[in-house]
A protein has these predicted regions:
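Metal-dependent peptidase/peptidase-like ectodomains
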Residues: 46, 84, 114, 136, ...
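Extracellular/luminal Protease-associated
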Residues: 69, 120-235, 302, 403-404
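Soluble metallo-hydrolase cores and metallopeptidase-like ectodomains found primarily
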Residues: 36-37, 111-112, 124-157, 225-304, ...
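N-terminal capping segment at the start of a domain
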Residues: 29-69, 104, 219-224, 296, ...
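Short helix-loop-beta-strand segments that form the rim/entrance of peptidase-like active sites
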Residues: 53, 319-345
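Second-shell loop/turn segments in exported
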Residues: 38-46, 60-70, 141-146, 155, ...
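His/Asp/Glu-rich mid-to-C-terminal helical/loop segments that flank catalytic regions of hydrolases
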Residues: 319, 323, 436-477
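Noncatalytic luminal/extracellular "stalk/propeptide" segments of secretory-pathway proteins
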Residues: 22-30, 34, 56, 60-177
Length: 477
């Protein structure tokens, strides 16, 4: 989701359209035959269980798929085999991925004003991806609570050096409850990503951040952090919403001391793969409609909504077309991206190989925001793309997915390079009230996926993919 942060800030100002026309043939866009086929595709996807069954296997059976892990390698082999069973042309594209391994992660408050004699208090903490380790015995230091980067700067080295900084920037729960969880995430994620480097600049010995997520169940949300050249690397972790509140309150009473132990390791990069599978087009086989999701995940849970659901919905598209014995006019290319979570090396490898072939990428679709009820789809590229969606929205009307939102900042991290190169890009459009309650934390488990709703996601992705593959004219770009 790294390249989606700008888009997250723009989501509230996107242009959303609802379409009301009936599904009649528009020969310059979609033939009556294509529209009839799209209705069949939607019905098969919405009523089927393929995406649900595949997401269940990836998340509950294979489990967390951290880049470089045995589980990620197993998932690559599994998905490739499913595509071969469908008769697709399958390619494993080599990708060198980070190999960061989580270790011990504990934290305790050891001193605070008014504490009972001999008391300690456990803090829910998780290491952030790519963090360096504390000593094996941990570190103990006073905590300095800051609400934002400006407050950190005002305090300066005199008040920060030798201490552990808690960035207590609050995730915007009101924005999340209004359905704009991605925008709330976009506001807070900078503290997770850049907090350690900012604190180290003033001599901090470690940084902890209030989780960039909407859980209120005392769960810490992990995610990627980054260091900066020329600034010391210090350990970095995230604490739960509730623990951040407690520490911030205790800090108003007097000094607070914390003992922090984080022992992750960064091992040498390791070889992995994107899974690429083509369902050849009948008329324009050298033009591609990408349909995709990412196969890797974080390691605190099963990576169910992030992103077993998305990748399963994506590769349900060729399964549905095979079931209905439909062949698209353009090639539908499924991609299971590797390493979205830790830097996007899979996306970068694909774009590097295909840079000279960008004009033949007709459209790109990415599913990576959960598996709740979709209300339509988002698109990026030329604003004029909006005129192409009326018939598709009407096909999706029976399941209430008629909205199309223009999001110029982009709609997906892994297809981001294609979007920036001018390829029209699409993603399912969700109400984001619940996604960030489970995002990157220990509750991202298969029970969060509803059988009916992932079928609806599959339907949106399949209708978009087949509609773009059979469009009668080029898209503006």
């Amino acid at each position: 989701m790294k390249r989606l942060i700008l888009a997250a800030g723009l989501v509230c100002i996107g242009i959303t359209m609802a379409f009301s026309q009936t599904t009649t043939a528009t020969p310059e866009l979609y033939s009556q035959k294509t529209l009839d086929e799209l209705h069949r595709i939607r019905e098969a996807a919405a009523s089927g269980t393929y995406a649900f069954d595949q997401a269940r296997f990836i998340s509950a059976t294979i489990g967390p798929r951290l880049s470089g892990s045995n589980e990620a390698a197993f998932a690559v082999k599994y998905v490739a085999e499913q595509m071969r069973k469908l008769g697709l042309d399958v390619k494993l594209q080599k990708v060198m991925v980070p190999h960061w391994v989580r270790g011990v992660e504990t934290a305790q408050l050891t001193e605070w004003q008014g504490m009972p004699p001999g008391a300690t208090r456990n803090v829910v903490v998780t290491a952030l991806g790519h963090s360096v380790a504390t000593p094996a015995s941990g570190i103990t230091a006073d905590v300095v609570v800051v609400n934002d980067f400006a407050e950190l700067e005002r305090l300066g080295r005199r008040n920060i050096e030798g201490k552990i900084v808690l960035f207590n920037y609050k995730f915007n729960m009101e924005l999340q409850e209004s359905g704009y969880g991605l925008a709330a995430y976009g506001q807070s994620v900078a503290y997770r990503t850049n907090g350690a480097a900012a604190a180290a600049k003033y001599g901090a010995v470690a940084a902890i951040v209030r989780s960039a997520g909407g859980s209120q169940s005392r769960l810490a949300h992990t995610g990627l952090m980054r260091y900066q050249d020329g600034i010391p690397k210090i350990p970095s972790g995230a604490v739960s919403y509730e623990d951040a509140e407690t520490i911030a309150y205790l800090a108003t009473l007097g000094p607070v001391k914390i003992h922090l132990t984080l022992t992750p390791q960064t091992l040498p990069d390791i070889e992995s793969y994107n899974v690429i599978a083509d369902l050849k087009g009948s008329e324009k086989p050298n033009e591609y409609v990408i349909v995709s999701g990412h196969l890797d995940s974080w390691d605190l849970a099963q990576g169910a909504i992030d992103d077993a659901a998305g990748v399963a919905a994506a590769y349900s598209v060729p399964a549905i077309l095979k079931e209905l014995r439909l062949q698209p006019k353009r090639t539908i290319r499924f991609i299971a991206w590797m390493d979205e979570e830790q830097g996007g090396s899979g996306s970068d490898a694909y774009f590097a190989e295909e840079k000279g072939n960008v004009p033949n990428h007709f459209a790109a679709i990415e599913a990576d925001l959960g598996a709740s009820h979709p209300i339509g789809f988002k698109y990026a590229g030329k604003p004029e793309l909006g005129r192409y969606f009326g018939p598709l929205s009407d096909v999706l009307r029976p399941q209430g997915a008629t909205l199309a939102q223009y999001q110029p900042g982009g709609v997906g991290a892994d297809i981001g390079p294609l979007t920036q190169a001018g390829v029209p890009s699409f993603a399912p459009f969700f109400n984001e009230q619940t996604y960030f309650k489970y995002h990157h934390n220990a509750a991202d488990t298969f029970d969060k996926i509803d059988r009916r709703e992932i079928g609806e996601v599959s339907a949106v992705v399949a209708v978009l993919a087949y509609g773009m593959a059979n469009l009668e004219q080029p898209l503006p770009r």
